[in-house]
């Protein structure tokens, strides 16, 4: 399982190698020069050496060490984003364009690694990194349980089912075309983002209710005698390169599908 997870992470980073993060003054030297790619590579090397030794990740430093490594990855991302904001200055335009897309692309490189947005030259092969880290954390929690507790905590063994069936997939600007920004205006989602060495595509990881699922007629497990239920797709804001009605190009927060929830109403007259 651990080897599979590392393979997924390496595959994920390979999708982003065409768009390296911009070097920020004062963030060079030491382990910061390597960045989170170096930390991930070190984790992969440790796991590989551990699996060759005794067949378990513990021989390469232990699963807790690996967890700390990926926590360091997230910390580095947050630190780099904060330093990038300082470099832009307090008067910099943070949300509604300005300065041209090419200039903004470099200053917003840190945003390429948001949880549900990626800028890449090919379709991402795996879910966003933060989703993989969450799944891996759940795996570590299960690994620390006894076999008996692990069996009883398995959702499949307990008969757990989702209230609403959902699907998640990467989509492009060609699929979205338009979106609603934070001011309620309809904007055009640009397919390509100018970068230093060319252009890359924007990808969005969307989650919505499955129209072919078993919950299209209502939520699972709800007493239909007393409640009306419906599975509905909800949205959240992410940052993307867009163009407004005045043909002004800039980075804006737009709404994309991010979850499928159950809504209930009480039946009247009961």
From Swiss-Prot:
Its main location: secreted. Keywords: Cleavage on pair of basic residues, Disulfide bond, Glycoprotein, Growth factor, Secreted, Signal. The keyword Calcium does not apply. Residues 1-18 form the signal peptide. GO terms for molecular function: growth factor activity; nerve growth factor receptor binding. GO terms for biological process: cell surface receptor protein tyrosine kinase signaling pathway; modulation of chemical synaptic transmission; negative regulation of neuron apoptotic process; nerve development; nerve growth factor signaling pathway; neuron projection morphogenesis. Glycans are attached at residue 144. SMART domains: NGF. The keyword Cytoplasm does not apply. Disulfide bonds join 164-231, 209-260, 219-262. One of its GO terms (cellular component) is synaptic vesicle. Residues 19-151 form a propeptide. Pfam families: NGF. It is found in: Secreted. Promotes the survival of neuronal populations that are all located either in the central nervous system or directly connected to it. PANTHER family: BRAIN-DERIVED NEUROTROPHIC FACTOR, NERVE GROWTH FACTOR NGF -RELATED. Belongs to the NGF-beta family. This is Neurotrophic factor BDNF precursor form.
């Amino acid at each position: 399982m651990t080897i599979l997870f590392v393979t997924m992470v390496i595959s994920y980073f390979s999708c982003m190698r065409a768009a390296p993060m911009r070097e920020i003054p004062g963030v060079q030297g030491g382990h910061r020069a390597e960045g989170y790619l170096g930390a991930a590579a070190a984790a992969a090397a440790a796991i590989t050496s551990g699996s060759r030794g005794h067949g378990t990740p513990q021989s390469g430093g232990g699963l807790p060490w690996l967890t700390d490594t990926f926590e360091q990855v997230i910390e580095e991302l947050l630190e780099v984003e904060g330093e990038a904001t300082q470099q832009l200055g307090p008067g910099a335009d943070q949300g509604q364009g300005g300065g041209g897309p090419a200039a903004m692309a470099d200053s917003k490189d840190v945003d390429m690694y948001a949880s549900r947005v990626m800028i890449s030259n090919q379709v991402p092969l795996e879910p966003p990194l933060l989703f993989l880290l969450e799944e891996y954390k759940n795996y570590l929690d299960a690994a620390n349980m006894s076999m008996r507790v692990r069996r009883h905590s398995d959702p499949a063994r307990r008969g757990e089912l989702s209230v609403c069936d959902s699907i998640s997939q990467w989509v492009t600007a060609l699929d979205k075309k338009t979106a609603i920004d934070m001011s309620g205006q309809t904007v055009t989602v640009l397919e390509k983002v100018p970068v230093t060495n060319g252009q890359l595509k924007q990808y969005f990881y969307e989650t919505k209710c499955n129209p072919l699922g078993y919950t299209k007629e209502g939520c699972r497990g709800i007493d239909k005698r007393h409640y009306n239920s419906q599975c509905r797709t909800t949205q959240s804001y992410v940052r993307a390169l867009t163009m407004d009605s005045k043909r002004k190009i800039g980075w804006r927060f737009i709404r994309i599908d991010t979850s499928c929830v159950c809504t209930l109403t009480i039946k009247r007259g009961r």
